[in-house]
Design a protein with these regions (language model features):
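Non-catalytic, surface beta->alpha helical segment in thiol-disulfide oxidoreductase systems
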Residues: 98-122
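Structural micro-motif
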Residues: 84-100
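Structural microenvironment flanking redox-active thiols in thiol-disulfide oxidoreductases
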Residues: 76-85
């Protein structure tokens, strides 16, 4: 009976520790939060699709700061078509970055290149 209490107590403590760690980690800012927010302030747009491996790689460069990216999803839900917003902008490859001066670059861009192109501090 004592072994059962010890096991249950250990499981509860472990579950509590895991819950605290998940909460703590989620509440911490991402490494590139300010950089991603700056891109949006500089009127940069990031066109991509959920099925594009290069788009996923580009987002992964930002880690959990990717939620602040000025991202525009171009794919229909079934992955077989392009949404009107991207069609109207003549987006033909992914990822496509559009800058305030109207210039565009397609493909995975390094964070350093984005910083240089936009003036956003990395």
């Amino acid at each position: 009976m004592n072994m059962k209490k010890i096991l249950v107590s250990a499981l509860l403590v472990g579950a509590g520790a895991i819950g605290w760690w998940i909460y703590y980690d989620a509440s911490q800012p991402g490494k590139y939060d300010a950089f991603a927010k700056c891109l949006e302030e500089k009127e940069v747009l990031f066109y991509g699709t959920f099925w594009c491996p290069h788009c996923r790689n580009q987002k992964a460069m930002f880690g959990k700061s990717d939620k602040y990216l000025p991202y525009i999803e171009c794919s229909t839900a079934d992955g077989k078509g392009q949404l009107p917003i991207c069609n109207e902008q003549n987006i033909s490859g992914y990822p496509t970055w559009e800058f305030a001066d109207g210039s565009r670059e397609t493909g995975e861009l390094s964070l350093a290149h984005l910083a240089q192109k936009t003036g956003c501090p990395l």
